[in-house]
Amino acid sequence: MKSPVAGAVLDPSTPPPTTGTSWRWPGLRDADPYREARLRMVEQLRRSGLVTSRRVLEAMARVPRHLFVPPEYRGMAYEDRPLPIGHGQTISAPGVVGRMLQLLDPQPGEKVLDVGAGSGYQSALLAELVTPGGRVYAVERIPELAEYARENLEKTGYRGVVEVVVGDGSKGLPQHAPYHRIKVAAAAPKPPKPLVEQLAPGGRMVIPIGTPDLQILTIIEKTPDGRVRERRDIEVLFVPLIGEHGYREDWRKQYWQWWR
C-alpha cells in the first residue's frame, strides 16, 4: 500500500505532547524495547494531521506492531510503511491504519467485522477500541494467514476479544450480523452488497473503493431508518478484495477486460 496523497486538518482540541517521546501514553510498559520507536511513530502520525483521534493514537501506542510482522521486518515495524507478511499480502502502513480507525470510530461494547485479518494487527487495535464489552470478528481468506493472526493475537493477549475465521470476506459473516462497524482492508470495485446488508442501522463501514491500482477510502453509513449514505476521504492503494462480491482470483485479467 502506498501512503495517502491527501492529508487531514489537525484537530485543535488534541492536547499537545511534551517534547520528544516523553509524552506518557496510558498502558505502556517501560520494559518494552520497542516502546520509544512506537511512541515516535505515534507522535509523527499526530503531527502529520493524518490521525488526530486521541483514542486511536493511544491504541496504536499500546499495540506492539513489531509482533505482527515477520522477524526479519521487526526493525522496520514502526516506520510508516506497509510490510510483507507472506502469501502476497501486506500489513498496511500505520498512517493508513490509523486513518481508517479514526473514520470508523468504533466504541466500547460494539461488535465489529474486520475483513482481511492479515497478521491480526488491525484486529488488535479494534479490540483495544471496543473494550470493554465489545467483540471483533475477523475474516481472512488465506488459511495460513488466519492461523498466523490467531497466533499473534494469542501472544499479545487479544484472543479473548477477537475471533478469526477463514472465509470469503466479501460475503461477511452473516451468522454474527448485524455489526456496528465494518472495516475492510482490501479494495473492492464497489461496496459488497452482503457487507452493506450486515451493517446495523446507525452503523458505519470503511472500505477502499476503486480499481486495483488506485482507490478512495470510502465511508458508508446506514441511517437508523435503513438508508445508505457514502462519503469519500483520501486516496489509498490496497491489495484487491478477492471474493464473490469483490475481485476474482484472476483479477488482473478481469481488470484489463473492463478497460478494453
UniProtKB/Swiss-Prot annotation:
The keyword Signal is assigned to this record: no
Location relative to the cell: Cytoplasm
Transmembrane segments: none
Catalytic activity reported: [protein]-L-isoaspartate + S-adenosyl-L-methionine = [protein]-L-isoaspartate alpha-methyl ester + S-adenosyl-L-homocysteine
Entry keywords, A to Z: Cytoplasm, Methyltransferase, S-adenosyl-L-methionine, Transferase
InterPro entries for the chain: PCMT, SAM-dependent_MTases_sf
Active site: S92
Origin: domain of life: Archaea
NCBIfam families named among the record's database cross-references: pimt, PRK00312.1
Function per UniProt: Catalyzes the methyl esterification of L-isoaspartyl residues in peptides and proteins that result from spontaneous decomposition of normal L-aspartyl and L-asparaginyl residues. It plays a role in the repair and/or degradation of damaged proteins.
Name used for this protein in its record: Protein-L-isoaspartate O-methyltransferase
Source organism of this protein record: Aeropyrum pernix (strain ATCC 700893 / DSM 11879 / JCM 9820 / NBRC 100138 / K1)
